[in-house]
UniProtKB/Swiss-Prot annotation:
GO BP, sorted A to Z: trans-translation
CDD domains: SmpB (cd09294)
UniProt key word Phosphoprotein: no
Source organism of the structure: Mycoplasma mobile (strain ATCC 43663 / 163K / NCTC 11711)
Protein name: SsrA-binding protein
UniProt keyword annotations, A-Z: Cytoplasm, RNA-binding
């Protein structure tokens, strides 16, 4: 499992509750662009239509002279019971479904998605403060 890209904003802005692995339906030029790390997950999110999951706002740069939609919604490959379970939890608990990592798994590109709860500004400030305290203590002890 080789990670292609991480969604660092997701870990800062959300509290991760459950994680899932999903396959992606991609075109050839999209795979080539991803292989060259020309992909961004910042601002991407998961939507549901007709019991199918799609990733929206995932930016894949165009490969050479191939013309295609860079922000096109791409279908995720999940089992029906997984989709229903995620949708149910999302609607019942008002959670967000966000992408965490894009990675290679046996020559297939997979996406790790998560059910997440948004953090408040106070939570984010508290996290930054904890991080600073840890750094300060580390400097003092060494």
């Amino acid at each position: 499992m080789k990670i292609i890209i991480k969604n660092k904003d997701a870990f800062f802005n959300y509290e991760i509750l459950e994680k899932y692995k999903a396959g992606l339906i991609l075109k050839g030029w999209e795979v080539k662009s991803i292989r060259e790390n020309k992909v961004q997950l910042k601002g991407a999110f998961i939507t549901f239509k007709n019991d199918e999951a799609y990733i929206t706002n995932m930016h894949i740069s165009q490969y050479m002279s191939v013309k295609g939609n860079e922000l096109e919604p791409r279908k995720l490959l999940l089992n029906k019971h997984e989709i229903r379970h995620i949708q149910d939890k999302k609607n019942r608990n008002s959670l967000a479904v966000i992408p965490l990592n894009l990675f290679w798994d046996n020559n297939y590109i997979k996406l790790e998605i998560a059910l997440a709860k948004g953090k408040t500004k106070a939570d984010k400030r508290h996290r930054i403060l904890e991080k600073d305290v840890r750094k300060h203590l580390k400097k003092i002890t060494y």
